């Protein structure tokens, strides 16, 4: 949800939905998938009421750094700070994921995970997340199911960019592992172990 507000730019999912909405279940696209952005306080309250002691969510690269590199979106920083603080106030442990299949479209246009430039941009994004939120977030995941973009996007045509090419899939797998390693290195260099 909240796909086109507060400075967030297009991810591959926004682009793909715009191009082929029929590929999405019941034609439901990024704009309508979640109300968490607007209702996070109520959602976190429900987490607490139902006995949850932790919550894993993701920081959207296309929201935090809309152009993939460079300027940080302050509205995104405020949103993620508010979510983290609300979780902590409610004794719910924040667990942050850095990539849940949502490549910024501007990074996909540079080759996505096929591009070493995108690997380096991801490491910089991860470092910025650690710097901004690492004072309160102690549990990080670099990638959600890292094999899915490889298989879905480059072998079996169920994720964007819908390619079927084993060589390119291998490159994407390698660069995903490299991006993981580089982001862990950034984390360790910040002394946040």
Give a label for each model feature:
Residues 31, 38, 71-74, 167, ...:
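Short, solvent-exposed segments of well-ordered alpha helices
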Residues 39-60, 93:
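Catalytic domains of carbohydrate-active enzymes, especially glycoside hydrolases
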Residues 1-24, 67-68, 78-193:
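Active-site region of glycoside hydrolase catalytic domains
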Residues 59-72:
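Glycine-rich, proline-tolerant flexible connector loops at the mouths of alpha/beta enzymes
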Residues 27-30, 51, 89-91:
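Homeobox/homeodomain signature
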Residues 33-47, 118-129:
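Short, acidic/polar
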Residues 10-45:
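Aromatic- and Gly/Pro-rich amphipathic surface segment
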């Amino acid at each position: 949800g909240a796909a086109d507000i507060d400075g967030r730019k297009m991810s591959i999912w926004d682009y793909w939905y715009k191009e082929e909405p029929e590929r999405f279940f019941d034609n439901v696209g990024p704009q309508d998938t979640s109300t968490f952005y607007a209702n996070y306080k109520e959602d976190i309250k429900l987490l607490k009421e139902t006995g949850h002691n932790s919550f894993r969510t993701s920081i959207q690269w296309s929201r935090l750094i809309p152009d993939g590199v460079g300027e940080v979106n302050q509205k995104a920083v405020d949103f993620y700070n508010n979510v983290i603080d609300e979780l902590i106030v409610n004794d719910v442990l924040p667990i942050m994921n850095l990539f849940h299949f949502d490549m910024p479209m501007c990074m996909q246009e540079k080759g996505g995970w096929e591009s070493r430039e995108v690997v380096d941009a991801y490491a910089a994004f991860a470092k910025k997340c650690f710097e901004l939120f690492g004072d309160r977030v102690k549990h990080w995941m670099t990638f959600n199911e890292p094999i899915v973009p490889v298989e879905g996007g480059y072998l079996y045509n169920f994720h964007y960019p819908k390619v079927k090419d084993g060589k390119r899939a291998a490159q994407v797998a390698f660069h995903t592992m490299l991006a993981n390693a580089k982001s862990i290195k950034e984390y360790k260099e910040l002394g946040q172990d």
